[in-house]
């Protein structure tokens, strides 16, 4: 698909990933509200797509809110998630991975995001990689976190998992975290690993 606009919709109680954009170019998603209470009810998954802007989103989901993956449908490049509010009952709020089956996953930005709830031990900002892609130029900027008892602030790792298919593992480089503010009452642990 090319030149796609998705605006002003509500997705309620999906039984799988609520919105999956796969193998597309030049996509704009805005003013979307997503409510999911089932396992696997991700918010928005951008998979092997290029030039995608996701803005002004509210998610309250049981699984991951914003995810970038590459499922063998081409490189994933120039993706921005911005100006959004995330509530997670389980899993990750912002994630690059786990499935990264492409040559390049690069220039991915998460900017001006409010995390208002996440009460599991999962990382709020994660990069999990076990396939062959070169992952680079990932930015988490201007992120505000309200309460996230037990959550990890961020987790970056290269490791094998049940979701990976490639035998060779790629690398991760040029990751930026800036203007991250935690205003909750819980001291979250911080995990950085490269396994």
Residue spans for each PLM region:
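Extracellular beta-rich repeat passengers
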Residues: 118-195
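Active-site-proximal loop/turn and secondary-structure-junction residues that shape catalytic pockets
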Residues: 23, 33, 70-72, 98-100, ...
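All-beta strand scaffolds that present successive hydrophobic residues in beta-strands
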Residues: 4-7, 27-31, 51-55, 76-82, ...
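Conserved beta-strand/loop scaffold segments within soluble protein domains that form the structured core
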Residues: 14, 68, 74, 80-82, ...
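Non-cytosolic beta-sheet module surface loops
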Residues: 9-10, 57-58, 85, 129, ...
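Short glycine/acidic-rich loop motifs that flank beta-strands on beta-rich extracellular proteins
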Residues: 15-21, 37-47, 51, 59-70, ...
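Internal alpha/beta core interface subdomains
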Residues: 1-33
């Amino acid at each position: 698909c090319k030149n796609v606009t998705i605006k002003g919709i509500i997705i309620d109680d999906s039984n799988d990933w609520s919105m999956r954009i796969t193998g597309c170019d030049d996509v704009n998603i805005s003013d979307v509200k997503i409510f999911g209470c089932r396992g696997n009810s991700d918010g928005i998954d951008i998979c092997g797509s290029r030039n995608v802007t996701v803005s002004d989103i509210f998610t309250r989901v049981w699984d991951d809110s914003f995810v970038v993956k590459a499922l063998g449908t081409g490189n994933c490049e120039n993706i921005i998630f911005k100006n959004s509010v995330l509530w997670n009952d389980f899993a990750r709020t912002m994630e690059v991975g786990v499935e990264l089956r492409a040559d390049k996953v690069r220039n991915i930005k998460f900017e001006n995001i409010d995390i208002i709830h996440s009460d599991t031990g999962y990382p709020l900002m994660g990069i999990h990689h076990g396939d062959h892609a070169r992952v680079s130029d990932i930015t988490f900027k201007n992120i505000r976190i309200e309460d996230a008892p037990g959550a990890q602030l961020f987790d970056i790792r290269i490791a094998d998992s049940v979701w990976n298919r490639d035998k060779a593992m790629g690398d991760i480089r040029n990751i930026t975290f800036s203007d991250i503010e935690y205003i909750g009452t819980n001291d979250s642990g911080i995990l950085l690993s490269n396994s």
